[in-house]
Amino acid sequence: MIAVLKAGYLSLRPEHSVVAVGPIPVADFVGGEACVACHAAQTTAWQRSQHARAMQRASPQTVQGKFDDARFPYAGVQSTFSRRDERFVVRTDGPDGKLADFDVKYTFGVEPLQQYLVELPGGRLQALSIAWDTRPQAAGGERWFHLYPNDRIDHRDGLHWTGRQQNWNFMCADCHSVNVRKQYDATNGTYATTWSDLSVGCEGCHGPGSAHIAWAKDKPPSDARMGLTVALDQRHGAKWTIDPASGNAKRDPPRVGDRRSTCARNAMHGGRKSPKVTSPVDRSSITTFPRC
């Protein structure tokens, strides 16, 4: 009877099932460059992806906004975006509310908007609230806009670009970079944040790769995991549906163990947009997905 029930159960299992493949190996982060030799095609595809451009050092090749002495008024403050040789400079209200010049250190995202990170004392990277709409001009893009257009956010507000809620170390780093160590010093309120990959590299989804590299040298058949710390086979057969009660997306079936579906999208990071979207941050008409 047990054998019959087991056979019936197996026949009902989905085509892509979850199979136990052994214990999770202990591994260290090695950086995406270590993957290129064996995975050249995947690297080329990744270089064209938004993952590769989730965060980049500011340069003429990465900055999409027009830093041509463009001016943007908001809440009584006139901000100016300009170029000084290879530097991208924003003149805007600082932590004390006074106008000052700030160098853009990094770009943040590429579509449908690009934000810019400025470094403040104490190792803090802050995301400017004035961003560049990267959509085509015909779609209403190629312009500067404020993330809170209907408010009057000044330096005393927690949502001001110099505040905690716009702090990269605290709010953004874990998803936009790999192997982030925030290293916050509570005594003096400073950061000494480090990472192994600035953008979302291979190990951002696959986990630390040292054990996989060790496996690749000999490829022992006994290691069905191939030295990988994260399995990505649960993307097969999975569906995301909106819970009417919470408004959040729910995965069906739920994830099991250490396996991971592909990184899900959310409203601010490439979510599917309806034709009614009139702004790159129009939450009302963007299908949302949870973080992975």
List the model feature ranges, each with a label.
Residues 32-35, 169-172, 202:
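Disulfide-stabilized extracellular ectodomain repeats and their linkers
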Residues 25-40:
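Local sequence-structure signature of Cys/Sec-based thiol-disulfide redox active-site neighborhoods
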Residues 120-129, 134-170, 174, 178-182:
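Extended acidic/polar, glycine-enriched regions
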Residues 16, 33, 41-109, 113-120, ...:
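Primarily the internal scaffold of c-type cytochrome electron-transfer domains
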Residues 22-23, 291:
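Extracellular/periplasmic ectodomains of large secreted or surface enzymes and adhesion receptors
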Residues 1-21:
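Post-cleavage N-terminal segment of exported redox proteins
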Residues 23, 27, 164, 194, ...:
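Residue-level marker of regulatory loop/turn positions in helix-turn-helix DNA-binding domains and
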